[in-house]
Amino acid sequence: LETRNSMVTVCISTNPENLWSEETGIYAMGHPYEDVYPFHGANFWQDWERPAYIEYYQEDGSLAFDMDAGISIHGEYTQGLDQKSFGIDARKKYGSEFIHYAVFPEKSYSHYQSIVLRNSGQDNGNTKLRDVLISQLMKETGLDYQAYRPAVLYLNGEYWGFYTLRESTDKHFLKANHPEINMENLDIIEGNWRVHQGDRLAYQELLNYIKSHDLSDAANYDYVKSKMDVDNFIDYQIAVIYGANVDNGNIKFWHERTESSKWR
């Protein structure tokens, strides 16, 4: 790299058609799509992945790793922004099932199935630091938080701006943070009730119980505490309130399908 940065540099190289083709490009508008933000129906709203070559350079300019991987546009409404987030996924069909590098030194594990180059979401046009700041402030509470590293992105050799490199919150993330769980035996649900893995039956049963029972009764409350980590939920609410998070649907919650597991 001729230009040295004081942070990590990620380079994504791919066939331009994979990005800009109106028919198949993941960054293109395509057709048809709604002509108002966030442009529902555009190509970047599709669940598409394209092959790419990834290079990851440390702050001193040295190459840490390079590999073939899959790239996709990441996020929800912020997909409509000019600077979009990217998911980078290691898969066997590209050569390796994992990124074998300690991308986030603060975590104890050193391999990842996927990572995210995040455009900072709703803070994209402002500090780009709010989400990272709250995550770092809450990391001693026991909440599962995404580690980060500041990074710059070059897309097919063109400078694409400042990003925050984050862990992907998937079953591999949960397994890395909770080695004791069986990651194939999980229910993972998003705040909009979208099921990422498993189903929502156990969660709905818990909600029905809460709605139909008096939680001022100690026995009823103890039952709820046996099904969800109440302290974990309180810590999450503290983060939401203190951080003035109005995008309250942007959450994932999970449990292992065992009798003793609690929703977190």
What are these regions (language model features)?
Residues L1-H74:
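Regulatory N- and C-terminal appendages and interdomain linkers associated
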Residues M7-T9, E49-Y53, D68-G70, Q83-S85, ...:
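Extracellular structured ligand-interaction cores
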Residues N18-T24, L63-F65, G80, S96-I99, ...:
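Short, solvent-exposed loop/turn elements at domain surfaces
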Residues Q79-H111:
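Compositionally biased P/S/T/G-rich terminal and signal peptide-adjacent segments
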Residues Y101-Y109, L117-Q122, N126, E158, ...:
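ATP-dependent phospho-/nucleotidyl transfer catalytic cores
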Residues E140-Y154:
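Short, well-structured beta-strand/strand-turn elements
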Residues K252-R264:
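Conserved protein kinase catalytic/activation segment
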Residues V36, A52-D60, L129-L143:
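Zn2+-dependent metallopeptidase catalytic core
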